[in-house]
């Protein structure tokens, strides 16, 4: 099972992602969070295989949380799922050590992306590669 932590400020997105991922035989959502501070706290407590997280959230954002998590756990697998395909965000996320960067509109790619990251590879959503 791929234990996955989902962090997004939108409760509808969190619940939708949970529903989509838990329909997979090999994915378990271990916790849900709403901001970067919760991402750090839940990562420490749950030790997920993959953290699926939005970049822009009120308060503590995803990039700041990723920096804190990767500072303490350099092998953490973080995949950003966002509406932003901005070069600045992509470059910053990858420099921090994120294993993936997906666009929210590409929902069908999420579960395969988690499997790819678990296999030791990195993933980038289609829009990001344009």
Enumerate the predicted regions with their spans:
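Conserved acidic segment of CheY-like receiver
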Residues: 1-13, 17-21
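Active-site residues of response regulator receiver
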Residues: 8, 54, 82
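Short hydrophobic/Thr-rich beta-strand motif most characteristic of the beta2 strand and flanking loop
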Residues: 26-34, 42
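Acidic catalytic/metal-coordinating carboxylates
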Residues: 35-38, 61-64
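Active-site beta3 strand of CheY-like receiver
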Residues: 46-52
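Receiver (REC) domain active-site loop signature in two-component systems and cognate sites
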Residues: 57
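Short, flexible helix-to-coil linker/hinge segments that flank and couple to helix-turn-helix
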Residues: 88-95, 105-130
């Amino acid at each position: 099972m791929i234990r996955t932590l989902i962090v997004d400020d939108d409760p509808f997105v969190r619940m939708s992602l949970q529903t989509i991922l838990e329909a997979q035989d090999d994915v378990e959502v271990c916790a849900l969070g709403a901001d970067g501070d919760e991402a750090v706290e839940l990562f420490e407590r749950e030790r997920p295989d993959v953290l699926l997280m939005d970049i822009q959230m009120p308060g503590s954002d995803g990039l700041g949380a990723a920096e804190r998590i990767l500072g303490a756990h350099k092998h953490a697998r973080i995949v950003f799922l966002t509406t932003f395909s901005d070069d600045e965000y992509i470059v910053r996320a990858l420099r921090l050590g994120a294993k993936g960067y997906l666009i929210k509109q590409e929902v069908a790619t999420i579960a395969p992306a988690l499997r790819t990251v678990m296999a030791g590879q990195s993933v980038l959503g289609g829009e990001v590669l344009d």
